[in-house]
Amino acid sequence: MIGGLFIYNHKGEVLISRVYRDDIGRNAVDAFRVNVIHARQQVRSPVTNIARTSFFHVKRSNIWLAAVTKQNVNAAMVFEFLYKMCDVMTAYFGKISEENIKNNFVLIYELLDEILDFGYPQNSETGALKTFITQQGIKGQHQTKEEQSQITSQVTGQIGWRREGIKYRRNELFLDVLESVNLLMSPQGQVLSAHVSGRVVMKSYLSGMPECKFGMNDKIVIDKQGKGGTTDDAGKSGKQSIAIDDCTFHQCVRLSKFDSERSISFIPPDGEYELMRYRTTKDIILPFRVIPLVREVGRTKLEVKVVIKSNFKPSLLAQKIEVRIPTPLNTSGVQVICMKGKAKYKASENAIVWKIKRMAGMKESQISAEIELLPTNDKKKWARPPISMNFEVPFAPSGLKVRYLKVFESKLNYSDHDVIKWVRYIGRSGIYETRC
């Protein structure tokens, strides 16, 4: 398990130090500073082994968090703890900075006492921690026996992520399906690689201890070995099934229900949380197709034409569209003509940046450019970097659909019909590139 936890600033000075095992000495602090923070070359690996000691580290702004151990531990568990620790600190005092850590060092030590027990991660749910650790410290002497028993039951009980007695004047539930679509396409329009990374993020403002049930597409296939393809016309009609390569859930989800019924049943935490994270490579709806045409006119001129086609329902609007067309290093001037939006040549970035505010589905637009080149003695041909694209669309490129979202609360006097529910789909570009 974790032998010690250290938090450093950008200079390598220790801001927080907590040692849980006798085999971790003061030399471990100096070893990390010298070999990682002050290393001549940037250390890319998140795990560094120094003298039979393993350092697992993450960086937030200019702050380093390092977990140290001499045992053979589960690396995924250690990183999960480090990221959870970052989330907890952010929830308590906002941005993780040197000033905030110094101003809240007593609070951080109190949090570590609860989150880590002899190096073993325990309760890291922010909602549960905030019931008995406040930014003013623990006020145990002012709490009644009833309040203290509620805290004990929450921390040690089955539902550690939600406290009892929550009340709202209006019960609301917000669900966001957030997806990032990644694509690499050949100049001929052949998909070389494509995948979607998705998250289901919820905000729950519900009274009592409700039971929520969330259903997706009629058929969900979990396929960890299958190789996925893509489809260009899937966006024109709703898909009844979706193949998910892998997925992870918040601890509140009852996995047995998902395995048998493919429905997600859970008692939600209060406030905002990530319910589910998934990845898919099959039957992806590609929101845009980029068709490039590059023609060399002698050695001092290039003619570029790029057509973008939207591939989704005409009733939907894509926003924040940006196409980046790379130019050679010896470019001397560019003349641009575009049908829609605004285009500008940025010499510092060696690219033509074409921006369109909005674009409806099943439409197309194009840009033409004449690129003047300076004579050069370099015999190497221009490598032609891929054309990249950014956008935001109001649907899920994976085809994921929310079929129902139900809330049950047996003890309080409200039903599913009394809950105001909001469902939103947002698809964004990840690395969306087309070779030219």
From Swiss-Prot:
UniProt record, GO biological process: clathrin-dependent endocytosis; intracellular protein transport; Wnt signaling pathway
Gene3D superfamilies: 3.30.450.60, Mu homology domain, subdomain B (2.60.40.1170)
Membrane topology per record: Peripheral membrane protein
Pfam families, per database record: Adap_comp_sub, Clat_adaptor_s
Location, primary (coarse class): membrane
Intracellular or extracellular location(s): Cell membrane; Membrane, Coated pit
Binding site for a 1,2-diacyl-sn-glycero-3-phospho-(1D-myo-inositol-3,4,5-trisphosphate): 342, 346, 355
Keywords: Cell membrane, Coated pit, Endocytosis, Lipid-binding, Membrane, Protein transport, Transport
PROSITE patterns per record: CLAT_ADAPTOR_M_1, CLAT_ADAPTOR_M_2, MHD
Ranges for domain MHD: 170-435
Similarity comment: Belongs to the adaptor complexes medium subunit family.
Family matches, as PANTHER family: AP COMPLEX SUBUNIT MU (PTHR10529)
Function summary: Component of the adaptor complexes which link clathrin to receptors in coated vesicles. Clathrin-associated protein complexes are believed to interact with the cytoplasmic tails of membrane proteins, leading to their selection and concentration. AP50 is a subunit of the plasma membrane adaptor. The complex binds polyphosphoinositide-containing lipids.
Protein name per Swiss-Prot or TrEMBL: AP-2 complex subunit mu-A
Annotated source species: Danio rerio
Gene that this sequence comes from: ap2m1a
